[in-house]
Amino acid sequence: MSGPKAVTAPSATLKIWNRLQHFPFGNKIFSWAVCLKAPYFSSVHPTITVLQPCRCEVRAPNRRGSHNHLGTYHAIASCNLAELAAGMMTDATLPTTHRWIPVGMTVQYLAKAGTDMHATASVDSMPELGDEPTALVVPVQVATADGTLAVRAEITMHISPRPPRPS
């Protein structure tokens, strides 16, 4: 991996995020729009609170629909939250010349959770990007409202150049 680089042109996602930050409830509107594009994420009712190159933070309320049979926050709901944070961070960080897709996830369940959840995805730097596909492992921590680390995930993103647009 190389040192931090300036993104040559912000992604469309990051441009929209930055525009909406000037409005009341801009992050809620943005999060709602993300869930329209990728509906499965709406199952955890996420709110993206931080989105910038190399970092994304997402919060989700402790709702009955996110519980398991024990009455605690479901492990797979935490995975959903982690994947959203990792994907949004990757999208905000990559130059517009490249695309990404998650191809793997490893998860450690560290503690039961019965509160609102907070996922943080961050990387120190991006790999060198060129004409060949590459992998980026995005670490994500999912914590409870009191800061207890409940889930640690590593999500592998396949990054490749965007194909040329047809004329």
Regions found by a protein language model. Give the residues of each.
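Non-catalytic linker/capping segments at the edges of enzyme domains
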Residues: 1-57
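Hot-dog-fold acyl-thioester-processing enzymes
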Residues: 15, 61-87
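Short coil/turn motifs at beta-sheet boundaries
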Residues: 39, 51, 98-100, 114, ...
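Soluble, non-transmembrane catalytic domains of enzymes that act on hydrophobic metabolites at membranes
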Residues: 43-61, 67, 73, 139-143, ...
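Hydrophobic beta-strand-centered segment that forms part of the acyl-chain substrate-binding groove
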Residues: 88-124
